[in-house]
A protein has these predicted regions:
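N-terminal glycine-/serine-/threonine-rich phosphate-binding loop
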Residues: 1-51
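Class I SAM-dependent methyltransferase SAM-binding "motif I" and its flanking Rossmann-like core
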Residues: 160-210
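Glycine-rich phosphate-binding loop
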Residues: 144-169
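A glycine- and small-aliphatic-rich helix-loop capping segment at beta-alpha/alpha-beta transitions
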Residues: 65-74, 97-98, 164-173
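Gly/Ser/Thr-rich loops at beta-strand to alpha-helix junctions
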Residues: 51-60, 155-158, 227-229
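Ligand-binding beta-strand-loop-alpha-helix segment within the catalytic cores
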Residues: 2-15, 26, 73-150, 202
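C-terminal functional extensions of proteins
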Residues: 199-229
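Glycine-rich N-terminal segment of FAD-binding domains in flavoprotein oxidoreductases
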Residues: 40-72
Length: 229
């Protein structure tokens, strides 16, 4: 029934805190503002900033890059842990130059757009690795936890590539860590429309994703919803 709620009904008794904004641009700007404010706060304290970051939504990144460059905000003590990446049928990262690669997207859209003297070192730009499934978990523990997890919500409710299962209890779902998955047909279809003009046959079948456990243990979680679902 939630599909048919108007704004007033949705805000009347939400199950989680909700903020309804004027348009998508306001959602993206709000995410970028919170990223910048948290980095500035942690920099002032002389502490590291650790974010879990998505490639979807991505509209926050141009705002973020502009603010970092204009305000000369150092990212030297900032860690970006990206949520996921596509894999080949051999369960390897897809090529970074592939237009679908999230690693390539972050390089093209974020890291190379920030002034070299401000951007974080490459070793602080983290992606889940199919050859080292505990790397993200170990890194988060070493860094003292995640300050904020930013993300979106997929067509079937997935966050990163974590999709709910009818055979799994909530506790089992929350216990999941970084792992390799086969991507659902719904997600492949939606992503093929958005990224490949509907070329479903060219969409990867596999991915690596951080787990709901890593997401749920962030000190804050911000999910930006900018589509019809």
């Amino acid at each position: 029934e939630y599909y048919y709620y108007n704004k007033e009904e949705l805000l009347k008794a939400p199950k989680i805190p909700l903020i309804v904004m004027e348009d998508n641009a306001a959602v993206f700007k709000s995410m970028a503002d919170e990223m910048v404010e948290e980095i500035k706060r942690k920099n002032a304290l002389g502490e590291n900033t650790v974010f879990i970051c998505p490639v979807g939504p991505v509209g926050q990144y141009p705002y973020f890059v502009d603010m970092v460059n204009e305000q000369n905000i150092s990212l030297k003590n900032v860690w970006f842990i990206n949520m996921d990446e596509y894999l080949t049928d051999d369960k390897e990262w897809i090529d970074k130059e592939d237009k679908l690669s999230f690693r390539g997207f972050m390089d093209r859209t974020v890291y190379t757009k920030i002034k070299p003297e401000l951007v974080m070192p490459e070793e602080q730009r983290i992606f889940p690795d199919p050859k080292n499934l505990t790397h993200i978990q170990d890194m988060i523990k070493k860094l003292g936890g995640v300050d904020i997890c930013f993300g979106g919500i997929g067509i079937n409710g997935h966050v990163a590539f974590n999709e709910a299962s009818d055979t799994m209890t909530p506790d089992e779902f929350l216990a999941q860590h970084t792992r390799v998955l086969e991507i659902s047909k719904e997600t492949r279809a939606v992503n093929s429309i958005g990224d490949l003009n509907g070329a479903l046959d060219d969409m990867p079948h596999y991915c690596i994703t951080i787990g709901i456990n890593e997401i749920a243990h962030a000190r804050k979680i911000r999910l930006g919803c900018f589509r019809d679902w």
